């Protein structure tokens, strides 16, 4: 029997499993079955908490999409992870150092129940995103299905492409998102963000996530949109990002500097399941 906790960050929901005190393994098939909202638990991603690989860190954790694929980063998941390890008594710290396959992060639990995540320095080099382009540009041309899109590309530990739209409610998220998420210029696939700029400190955003379709919120997508908007001269260093599930605050002082994301993390229930 495996004990788990259902959590969400702005409606982006997770099955969180303690792999520190439990011996657990999930196959891609098991994850797909558990993620099914009709016949399983239902979630966007599974978070597996593990002991640290580095003695200077507190934990390592792994992130799996609903389709069973393992991914590098998840901003909303990072906040839920931090709240989970504190709630379950796995740590008493307010400042938690962790690693994922994308690298190291620092998480800070706030007094109001929110969590601030140091998401690291945004990766702009196309080769490291990875994105097939000759050199870094603030705006790229991306062609798909006889359409041409103006976009920005960045990695927050996972690849993102961001398109600006006039009206977020009319954005072709499902159609264009499905086209671009597997675009040949992104060898590992890509998360697709649709951004409406409201003011220099305020955007609205919808994200088609790689391996999960559109979700209510995407933390790393919010970070990517803030970066692209600032690089293109449309946004300042502090931005409120409104997603379908709620709002995040992003702080970024520019190229070469780490980006900070602040937002909520909520526990829904504890459960146990036989695999």
Swiss-Prot record:
PROSITE patterns, per the entry: DAP_EPIMERASE
A GO molecular function assigned to this protein is: diaminopimelate epimerase activity
Q: In which pathway does it act?
A: Amino-acid biosynthesis; L-lysine biosynthesis via DAP pathway; DL-2,6-diaminopimelate from LL-2,6-diaminopimelate: step 1/1
Q: Which residues catalyse the reaction?
A: 74, 218
- GO process terms (BP): lysine biosynthetic process via diaminopimelate
- Classification of source organism: Bacteria, Pseudomonadati, Pseudomonadota, Gammaproteobacteria, Alteromonadales
Positions contributing to substrate binding = 12, 45, 65, 75-76, 158, 191, 209-210, 219-220
The record's annotation in Pfam families points to: DAP_epimerase
* Enzyme Commission code(s) on record: 5.1.1.7
UniProt protein name: Diaminopimelate epimerase
């Amino acid at each position: 029997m495996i004990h788990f906790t259902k959590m969400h960050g702005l409606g982006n929901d997770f099955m969180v499993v303690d792999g520190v005190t439990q011996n657990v393994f999930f196959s891609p098939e098991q994850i797909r079955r558990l993620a099914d909202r009709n016949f399983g638990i239902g979630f966007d991603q599974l978070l597996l908490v593990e002991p640290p690989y580095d003695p200077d860190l507190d934990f390592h954790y792994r992130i799996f999409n609903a389709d069973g694929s393992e991914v590098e980063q998840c901003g909303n998941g990072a906040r839920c992870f931090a709240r989970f390890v504190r709630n379950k008594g796995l740590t008493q710290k307010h400042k938690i150092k962790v690693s994922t396959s994308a690298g190291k992060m620092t998480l800070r639990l706030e007094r109001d129940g929110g969590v601030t995540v140091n998401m690291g320095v945004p990766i702009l080099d196309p080769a490291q995103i990875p994105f097939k382009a000759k050199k870094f540009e603030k705006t790229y041309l991306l062609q798909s299905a006889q359409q041409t899109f103006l976009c920005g590309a960045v990695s927050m530990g996972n690849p993102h492409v961001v398109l600006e739209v006039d009206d977020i409610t009319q954005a072709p998220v499902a159609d264009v998102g499905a086209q671009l998420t597997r675009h040949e210029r992104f060898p590992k696939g890509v998360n697709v963000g649709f951004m409406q700029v409201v003011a220099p400190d305020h955007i609205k955003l919808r994200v088609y996530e790689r391996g999960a379709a559109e979700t209510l919120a995407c933390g790393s997508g919010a970070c990517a949109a803030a970066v692209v908007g600032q690089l293109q001269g449309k946004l300042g260093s502090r931005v409120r990002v409104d997603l379908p599930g709620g709002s995040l605050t992003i702080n970024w002082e520019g190229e070469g500097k780490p980006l900070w994301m602040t937002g909520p993390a909520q526990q829904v229930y504890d459960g146990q399941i036989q695999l």
